[in-house]
Amino acid sequence: MQWEVVIGLETHTQLSTVSKIFSGASTAFGAAPNTQAAPVDLALPGVLPVLNKGAVERAIVFGLAIGAKIAPKSIFARKNYFYPDLPKGYQISQYEIPVVQGGTLTFQVEGKNGQPGYEKTVQLTRAHLEEDAGKSLHEDFAGMTGIDLNRAGTPLLEIVTEPDMRSAAEAVAYAKALHALVMWLGICDGNMQEGSFRCDANVSVRRGPDAPFGTRCEIKNLNSFRFLEEAINYEVRRQIELIEDGGTVVQETRLYDPDRKETRSMRSKEDAQDYRYFPDPDLLPLVIGDDWIERVRATLPELPAAMAARFESAYGLPKYDASILTATKATAAYFEAVVADAGAANAKAAANWIMGEVASNLNRADLDIDAAPVSPAQLAKLLARIADGTISNNTAKKDVFPAMWAGEHGGDADAIIAEKGLKQMSDSGELEKIIDDVLAANAKSVEEFRAGKEKAFNALVGQAMKATRGKANPAQVNDLLKKKLGAA
């Protein structure tokens, strides 16, 4: 029996406003408990919520970026439930009419086990504004639970997809693309450790693509891409095994235990009627006119997809390279700065170096590209020295770039090349003499090459490079050898 996995995601993105969605209290992370909670956040009597305009504009920015409809009129509703860290006994959210309606997000799914990657588009159902709840501190007090209301009232944009994903890999790829987009737009800092970006996964299975949807379970508060993938894969296995053993999947909310790598039941899954939604009488309908939308549209940065398309057309980059270079705004800016100095002719080389040597060194040092020890101008100079034949690409990787990364000579490629004596041989007469000596000393390899053994030619190239201590231009060595062997 071929099972099909069906996944939809709800993502809570904390909006990057300085103050909360309905009060003037700060949203800064890490303050002492209950020091950033205004009377509205504490649900003190006689206080009224005031909507944060910045939160609304960030929602509009997101809606425009995904091609969604911005509702001309949306309603705030009270979502009623009891929890100790929810002082009002309800959460202000949006239910029937969200501010952002529809939209799509297109992204790349990496291939696995030899399978090629592919492009995927997910339909978004909605994105609505709401306030966050406070935080229960279970481990800080012996036999008691503490309540920190600093987070209460923090502005969230809850982004909901259609059940369009068919594997954990697709769900993770979507989450990564969404994470990159909200950071690119500047509407969320994307800090998953601090809870700024967290996902709920709705997972079900069915017997093939034409079967009715199965009973779904919601896995709450997944705050890393690894946890998201592990939780979905476990839940899929659990549901399939349960059904195949004659059991029935129960609609419920589950939590993921990363230590045991399993999900466990938290509570039965609520339906909308359980929350008794009704319009909040303290808040007027949110009215967004076309003029407001156009003012916000004018502030939008170039979007990743548009920039990637420009990189393909302007610089002749492959689609994969363009997508990697536009994964973050900082990476794209670094690439464009390198190309501005090195010239468009070196764009492909710049892309290769940024995705290769620069990325691997950043990963090892756990640095963002903004903090790279090698500046775009310094990398551009290194590329120029490769292009003009001063050094080979191999020498640049093995000897020059590591020294630049370590800050030798202020990261100046020319100074490092001179100090280490790495400049390639420019005297063709001297190189020709060395190659003659190599051919004379390796008569067996010459004979094997002439007998049709291509590997013998590579051996001769290696001997020539060794004789020049790596200072010869490999392309020039190849050309001279072929000429002298009559293979040119």
Swiss-Prot record:
One of its GO terms (molecular function) is asparaginyl-tRNA synthase (glutamine-hydrolyzing) activity. Its EC number is 6.3.5.-. It comes from the Bacteria. It catalyses: L-glutamyl-tRNA(Gln) + L-glutamine + ATP + H2O = L-glutaminyl-tRNA(Gln) + L-glutamate + ADP + phosphate + H(+); L-aspartyl-tRNA(Asn) + L-glutamine + ATP + H2O = L-asparaginyl-tRNA(Asn) + L-glutamate + ADP + phosphate + 2 H(+). SMART domains: GatB_Yqey (SM00845). PROSITE patterns: GATB. One of its GO terms (biological process) is translation. InterPro entries: Asn/Gln-tRNA_amidoTrfase_suB/E, Asn/Gln-tRNA_Trfase_suB/E_cat, Asn/Gln_amidotransferase, Asn/Gln_tRNA_amidoTrase-B-like, GatB, GatB_C_1, GatB_Yqey_C_2, Gln-tRNA_amidoTrfase_suB_CS. SUPFAM superfamilies: GatB/YqeY motif (SSF89095), Glutamine synthetase/guanido kinase (SSF55931). Gene3D superfamilies: 1.10.10.410, GatB domain, N-terminal subdomain (1.10.150.380). Keywords: ATP-binding, Ligase, Nucleotide-binding, Protein biosynthesis. Pfam families: GatB_N, GatB_Yqey. Belongs to the GatB/GatE family. GatB subfamily. Heterotrimer of A, B and C subunits. Allows the formation of correctly charged Asn-tRNA(Asn) or Gln-tRNA(Gln) through the transamidation of misacylated Asp-tRNA(Asn) or Glu-tRNA(Gln) in organisms which lack either or both of asparaginyl-tRNA or glutaminyl-tRNA synthetases. The reaction takes place in the presence of glutamine and ATP through an activated phospho-Asp-tRNA(Asn) or phospho-Glu-tRNA(Gln). This is Aspartyl/glutamyl-tRNA(Asn/Gln) amidotransferase subunit B. The gene is gatB.
